[in-house]
C-alpha cells in the first residue's frame, strides 16, 4: 500500500529497469514519510574491457549503457527524494580463460542493448567470440588471467515529510504544530 514501507533495499536490480524514473516514482509512492531507500546497481565503466574488444571487432557494445551515479542522484531528486548520497567503486574480476568469462556473463542476466544481434547465434559465433577475446583482450594480469571491471554504484536517499504550503496567510492546526515540534 502507498506510504507503508519504511525502508526499501534494491541490490543490483535498478540497472535492469527499462524506465528507471517510473520505478523511482513507484518507490517514492511506497515509502512512508521519512522512509529510506538504498540501492546498488552497475555503472558505466562496467564491462569496459569487453566493450573495447567489441569495438575493435566492429561489433555494437556488448550491453546496454549503464547510468552514471550523478544521473542517479539527479533522478532521485527529480522524483521527490531528499538528501541523496551517491558513491561508486570498481571491482575487478579475474578469469582463467574466455570460456569462464563468457559463462559468468551469461549467468549475470540479460542484454538490453537495442543494437544487439536479433537472433540466436550458433557455434561459429561462439568460437569467433572466444578467439577474439583470447587474441584482443586489453587487460591480462601477469599470470595471464582476463581482468573484467564492474563499476558498482551505491545510492541512498530519504522520502521527506510532506511540507505545508506557505502563502500570505497559512493556517496550521494545533495538533499539526505539536507534531511538527515533536519531530525536531
Model features per residue range: what roles?
Residues 1-8:
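A short acidic, Gly/Pro-enriched loop at the edge of an enzyme's catalytic core
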Residues 12-15:
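Short catalytic micro-motifs in class I SAM-dependent methyltransferases
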Residues 18:
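Conserved redox-active cysteine motifs that mediate thiol-disulfide chemistry
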Amino acid at each position: 500500500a502507498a506510504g507503508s514501507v519504511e525502508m526499501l533495499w534494491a541490490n543490483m536490480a535498478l540497472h535492469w529497469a527499462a524506465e528507471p524514473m517510473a520505478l523511482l516514482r513507484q518507490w517514492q509512492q511506497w515509502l512512508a514519510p521519512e522512509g529510506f531507500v538504498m540501492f546498488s546497481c552497475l555503472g558505466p565503466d562496467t564491462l569496459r574491457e569487453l566493450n573495447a574488444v567489441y569495438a575493435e571487432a566492429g561489433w555494437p557494445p556488448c550491453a546496454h549503457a549503464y547510468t552514471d551515479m550523478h544521473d542517479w542522484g539527479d533522478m532521485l531528486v527529480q522524483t521527490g527524494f531528499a538528501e541523496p548520497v551517491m558513491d561508486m567503486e570498481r571491482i575487478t574480476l579475474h578469469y582463467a580463460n574466455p570460456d569462464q568469462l563468457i559463462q559468468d556473463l551469461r549467468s549475470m542476466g540479460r542484454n538490453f542493448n537495442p543494437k544487439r544481434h536479433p537472433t540466436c547465434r550458433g557455434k561459429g559465433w561462439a568460437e569467433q567470440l572466444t578467439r577474439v577475446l583470447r587474441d584482443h583482450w586489453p587487460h591480462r594480469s601477469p599470470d595471464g588471467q582476463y581482468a573484467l571491471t564492474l563499476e558498482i554504484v551505491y545510492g541512498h536517499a530519504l522520502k521527506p515529510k510532506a511540507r505545508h504550503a506557505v502563502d500570505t496567510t497559512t493556517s496550521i492546526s494545533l495538533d499539526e504544530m505539536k507534531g511538527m515540534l515533536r519531530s525536531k
